[in-house]
């Protein structure tokens, strides 16, 4: 191969390849997409159809996708519903029902084939295999599949014997299952309890001696106690750490941006300005709203910036400042209007529109950087009960994307208006959102992606979606 003169090539930060310098400037500019794994990982759920298993699989998938690890859930129950169109009763799950056992095995094998496609052909990094997997035989089958394909494996066993937790889970989750469509609550509960008894007949829990060579975490009573064994590698470590920081205690998380700031009025991004007159009015309205909610043991978090601190001061309660909650760093574009950015840095303005999530401001941050900065905040939010987070537009988008399972493409364009509280209530398989406008007008700071994102676009087409400002 002929030698290439120094300076003729540069490294493309998104694709991690060397490209001609002249072409590089026409490509998107951003932070590298993180590659957390040297080989794909399978997370295998284990346990009776009791609380925690599907809850864990969906919650874990949401978290791993949010931090940049492409992850997908493979729910074997869904494969079974597609194979058997009409569910009759628990008899299908009896261990002596040979025909049904064969169908269930074929469904598991079909799911494993889809896992292979996802991890080996679609650039997935983690597959969460959501099934009971209660027998040592089934787990051995999965381990053989993983070895043949070069995947790492982490088992996650959910064990729950608390009657109160089991009853609440049945009430929240199982009665809404497609299996029980058209059934009365009493019929659904009775059948589901019989189904659990069917699984109990062949259930072989992970054993500390027999399974000492496996990587696993056992979760008792949805987080009361944990037992981890041979946790290896980055993905497994982060997975276990995350699972040990979650709980199912009923709670509410309130997200609010600061009150309108002086720089918001002028259409300038970033900076550390104080509140406008209307911003101070919002701070008072927020205080009245929080008092009216009578929230038990509410914690209040802010960033280190004036506008969030001034908003929190009106509450008259202690608050905790997080530097991690500071607004995205716009680097050389701090305190500029969009019009000024287009005039001085038209190429940067276009590059950001091309890939807003990964684009990094010169000497500043990208949304991808911000997600990594906010991970400790998410961990602490998962540990807490009722929390009010007073933050900033980009920060609120990142937090909201985590709780609502939004993609990196959707995240930078989530609407987070000023003077509006979002109340998030975690439920069985997701999060309910209530938007509460507190009747104090404010400027609009939301800018949609323009249709034309080409570097050579006219200024008018670059600025067409810029909101009005003074």
From Swiss-Prot:
Domain of life according to the entry: Eukaryota
Known tissue expression: Liver.
Pfam families on file: 6PF2K (PF01591), His_Phos_1 (PF00300)
Marked site: Transition state stabilizer: 257, 264, 392
Ranges where the record places region Fructose-2,6-bisphosphatase: 250-469
Regulation affecting activity: Phosphorylation results in inhibition of the kinase activity.
Single GO term (MF): ATP binding
GO annotations of cellular component type: 6-phosphofructo-2-kinase/fructose-2,6-biphosphatase complex; cytosol
Active site: 130, 160, 258 (tele-phosphohistidine intermediate), 327 (proton donor/acceptor)
GO biological process, one term: fructose 2,6-bisphosphate metabolic process
SMART domains in UniProt: PGAM
Role played: Synthesis and degradation of fructose 2,6-bisphosphate.
PANTHER family: 6-PHOSPHOFRUCTO-2-KINASE/FRUCTOSE-2,6-BISPHOSPHATASE (PTHR10606), 6-PHOSPHOFRUCTO-2-KINASE_FRUCTOSE-2,6-BISPHOSPHATASE 1 (PTHR10606:SF15)
Protein name: 6-phosphofructo-2-kinase/fructose-2,6-bisphosphatase
């Amino acid at each position: 191969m002929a030698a290439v003169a120094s300076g003729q090539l540069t490294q493309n930060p998104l694709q991690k390849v060397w490209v001609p310098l002249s072409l590089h400037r026409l490509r998107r500019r951003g932070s590298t997409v993180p590659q957390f794994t040297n080989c794909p990982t399978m997370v295998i759920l284990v346990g009776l159809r009791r609380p925690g298993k599907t809850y864990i699989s969906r919650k874990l998938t949401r978290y791993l996708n949010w931090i940049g690890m492409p992850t997908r859930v493979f729910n074997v129950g869904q494969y079974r519903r597609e194979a058997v169109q009409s569910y009759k009763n628990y008899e299908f799950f009896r261990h002596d029902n040979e025909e049904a056992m064969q169908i269930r095995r074929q469904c598991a094998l079909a799911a494993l084939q889809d896992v292979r496609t996802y991890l080996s052909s679609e650039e997935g990094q983690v597959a969460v295999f959501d099934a009971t997997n209660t027998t040592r035989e089934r787990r051995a089958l999965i381990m053989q599949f993983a070895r043949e394909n070069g995947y790492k494996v982490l088992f996650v066993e959910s064990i729950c014997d608390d009657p109160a937790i089991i009853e609440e889970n049945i009430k929240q989750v199982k009665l809404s299952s497609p299996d029980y469509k058209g059934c009365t609550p009493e019929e659904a509960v009775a059948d589901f309890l019989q189904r659990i008894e069917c699984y109990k007949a062949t259930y072989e829990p992970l054993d500390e001696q027999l399974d000492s060579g496996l990587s696993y975490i056992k979760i008792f009573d949805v987080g009361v106690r944990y037992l981890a064994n041979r946790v290896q590698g980055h993905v497994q470590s982060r997975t276990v750490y995350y699972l040990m920081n979650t709980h199912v205690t009923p709670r509410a998380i309130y997200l609010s941006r600061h009150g309108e700031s002086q720089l918001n009025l002028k259409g300038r991004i970033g900076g550390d300005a104080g509140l406008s007159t209307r911003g101070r009015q919002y701070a008072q309205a927020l205080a009245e709203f929080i008092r009216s909610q009578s929230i038990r043991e509410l914690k209040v978090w802010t960033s280190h910036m004036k506008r969030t601190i001034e908003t929190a001061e009106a509450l008259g309660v202690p608050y905790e400042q997080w530097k991690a909650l500071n607004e995205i760093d716009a680097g050389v574009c701090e305190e500029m209007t969009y019009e000024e950015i287009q005039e001085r840095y038209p190429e940067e303005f276009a590059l950001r529109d091309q890939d807003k999530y990964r684009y990094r401001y010169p000497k500043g941050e990208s949304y991808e950087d911000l997600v990594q900065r906010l991970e400790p905040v998410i961990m602490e939010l998962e540990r807490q009960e009722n929390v009010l987070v007073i933050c900033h537009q980009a920060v609120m988008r990142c937090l909201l994307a985590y709780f609502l399972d939004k993609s990196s493409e959707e995240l930078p364009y989530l609407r987070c208006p000023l003077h509006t509280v979002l109340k998030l209530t975690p439920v069985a398989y997701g999060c309910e959102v209530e938007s509460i406008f507190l009747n104090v007008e404010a400027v609009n700071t939301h800018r949609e992606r323009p249709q034309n994102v080409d570097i050579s676009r006219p200024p008018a087409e670059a600025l067409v979606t810029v909101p009005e400002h003074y």
